[in-house]
């Protein structure tokens, strides 16, 4: 009986984790696209392969315990994009850490000149969004953009 209850608990937890990932991605995507619309730009579309890469990148930063565009393990994020077989001629990455909510990290990205430039780049059509939390509770956030 305990084994069956444990299996049900694991199933429910995996569903909850999956739901929360999708929810934060939707919130960030909405914030980004509202700002793009204000600037007469087409909305970005979620690319699940870019989401996967963004999550890998966020998890990598938790392992390294630092926010960086370059990883000891993967090099630059664009290596992961190429490895996944995604063709692009233009790409960018926004990263952040420490912000507790998707709304707040989006607000901070939009207030930063460089991050805002990536979000409002006319040529970008696709976005991947990821996050990971380290053992100390610090959250690392990633956005990846491609045309």
Region roles according to the model:
Residues 93-147:
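Disulfide-stabilized extracellular recognition modules
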Residues 21-63:
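A short alpha-helix/helix-coil micro-patch that ends at or immediately precedes a cysteine
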Residues 38-52, 65-73, 92, 116-122, ...:
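Surface-exposed patches in mature extracellular/periplasmic domains of secreted proteins
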Residues 52-100, 119:
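Short, surface-exposed glycine/acidic/tryptophan-bearing loops
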Residues 4-13:
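Sec-dependent N-terminal signal peptides
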Residues 12-24:
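Bacterial Sec-dependent signal peptides at the C-terminal "C-region" and cleavage site
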């Amino acid at each position: 009986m305990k084994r069956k209850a444990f299996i049900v608990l694991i199933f429910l937890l995996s569903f909850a984790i999956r739901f929360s990932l999708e929810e934060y991605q939707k919130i960030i995507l909405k914030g980004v696209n509202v700002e793009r619309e204000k600037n007469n730009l087409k909305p970005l579309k979620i690319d699940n392969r870019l989401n996967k890469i963004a999550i890998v990148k966020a998890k990598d930063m938790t392992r390294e315990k630092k926010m960086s565009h370059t990883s000891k393990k993967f090099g630059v994020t664009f290596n992961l994009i190429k490895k996944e077989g995604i063709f692009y001629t233009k790409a960018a990455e926004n990263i952040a850490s420490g912000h507790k909510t998707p709304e707040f990290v989006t607000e901070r990205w939009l207030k930063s000149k460089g991050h805002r430039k990536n979000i409002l780049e006319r040529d970008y059509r696709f976005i991947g969004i990821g996050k990971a939390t380290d053992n100390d509770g610090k959250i690392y956030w990633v956005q990846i953009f491609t045309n």
